[in-house]
Amino acid sequence: ALQVLSFDLPGHGGRKDEPAPCRIQVCVPELKAVMGYAKKRWAHVGLFACSLGACFSLAAYADEPLEQALFLSPVLDMRRLIENMMGWFGVTQERLCRERAIETPTGETLYWDYYCYVKEHPVRRWDTPTSILCGVRDELCEPDVTARFARQYGCRLLTRPEAGHYFHTPKELEALRQWLTASL
């Protein structure tokens, strides 16, 4: 029997109205605290993470002996995502360095210190047996990034041609259910 322990990132789910920023420097210590809690209670710990949660989990849990990881629409290269966002909104590195924080038209904020952090701390290790489900039409996480990560770290990769970043249609949710059932 599985026991599920859920954690929302700042600004998401049950923490939607929290003022804490959803940044790797904030979330990694929180994720490490959650892992400490889980390891005190259960001998076998696995991970399910989606989007930014996967990115932050890669940073927090690289040295953890996890049974397995399941990633849904994972952000696997935060540097590339930030640089893509900078390009979409015409923000140069020089401007971001000078202004330190720039709010985008989508409501997301680009931060210089965050950008520097992800440049200095790319994923260097991931030994956990991992399965990834993502959409071919993912507008945030480019398929080549996901495929390269899967090859580099020996992950099982399943792509859905009809899906984008957010799995939400009945067909996408059914694909998610089938993937979870097959993976567990």
Residue ranges, per PLM feature:
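Conserved alpha/beta-hydrolase
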Residues: A1-D17
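Nucleotide-sugar donor-binding loop of glycosyltransferases
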Residues: D8, S51, V136
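Catalytic nucleophile-loop/oxyanion-hole region of alpha/beta-hydrolase
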Residues: H12-R41
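Soluble or luminal CAZymes and related metallo-dependent hydrolases
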Residues: V26-E30, L110, E172
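The alpha/beta-hydrolase serine catalytic core
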Residues: H44, P65-R148, Q152-T159, G164-F167, ...
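Gly/Ala-rich beta-loop-alpha elbow adjacent to hydrolase catalytic centers
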Residues: A49-S57
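Aromatic pocket-lining residues of Rossmann-like dinucleotide-binding sites
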Residues: A60-Y61
